Design a protein with these regions (language model features):
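Hydrophobic N-terminal alpha-helices or hydrophobic patches in metabolic proteins across all domains
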Residues: 1-216
Length: 216
């Protein structure tokens, strides 16, 4: 099959058309969201007078979750105060001193990713009640992955502060977009469209049987 004919056949396939349309919605949602986020005061016109409270709440979740994981899995010595991690070690005189400080700020709250996921769900195909339920579940997944991200970055920062910025910008940040893409893919694959019902098999009793006498 020639390439143009293959492309035409692929596009004319109804399933491929749906997938292409939903993928375009993913791209449009991402572009529109980032344009609005960076060029408007999106946080204020979404949350109004509750903006600071909303960000404080989700930042506290990220900080508390990261702190719990640090206390459980990290081998570093640190002190926590006011959403900050103070990493300590003994100096030459044997006294404990802080050698690095990491603060969990509003940008670490994952609200941006949740809002992007919300816009994506609004534009995606599917029933609204299903999208509402999936948005709540997907937002929880984003929050949990963000806590894991905070923990990994905090532990990395305590071990090697000089490597932190690179991994923050080029590893940890893209991971959150991978999570959003995975949530979109699961939605499209399993929830966006109603599965076609299989044709009910005919009742065998209604079919003529070779064992029964047939009228001439």
């Amino acid at each position: 099959m020639k390439e143009p004919q293959f492309i035409k056949t692929t596009i004319e396939n109804p399933k491929n058309r749906k997938l292409l349309k939903d993928f375009l919605m993913l791209v449009v949602a991402s572009v529109v969201f980032h344009f609005l986020y960076w060029n408007t005061d999106m946080n204020s016109w979404l949350f109004g007078p509750f903006t600071d409270r909303v960000f404080d709440f989700f930042t506290l979740i990220a900080y508390t979750g990261g702190k719990m994981l640090m206390n459980t899995f990290s081998s570093l010595d640190f002190v926590c105060e006011n959403s900050s991690f103070y990493f300590i070690q003994p100096n030459e005189q044997g006294q404990l001193q802080c050698y690095a400080t990491m603060q969990i700020i509003h940008d670490c709250s994952a609200i941006k990713q949740i809002m992007q996921f919300l816009l994506l769900m609004v534009l995606c195909s599917g029933k609204w009640w299903k999208k509402a339920i999936y948005f709540v579940g997907g937002s929880l997944v984003i929050v949990l992955f963000n806590i894991l991200r905070i923990y990994l970055l905090t532990d990395l920062f305590g071990h090697n502060p000089l490597q932190f910025q690179y991994y923050h910008d080029w590893v940890a940040r893209p991971i959150m977009y991978v999570v959003i893409f995975a949530l979109w893919a699961v939605w499209i694959q399993f929830f966006a469209y109603s599965k076609p019902k299989d044709d009910c098999p005919q009742d065998k009793r209604s079919l003529p049987s070779s064992d029964l006498p047939m009228a001439d």
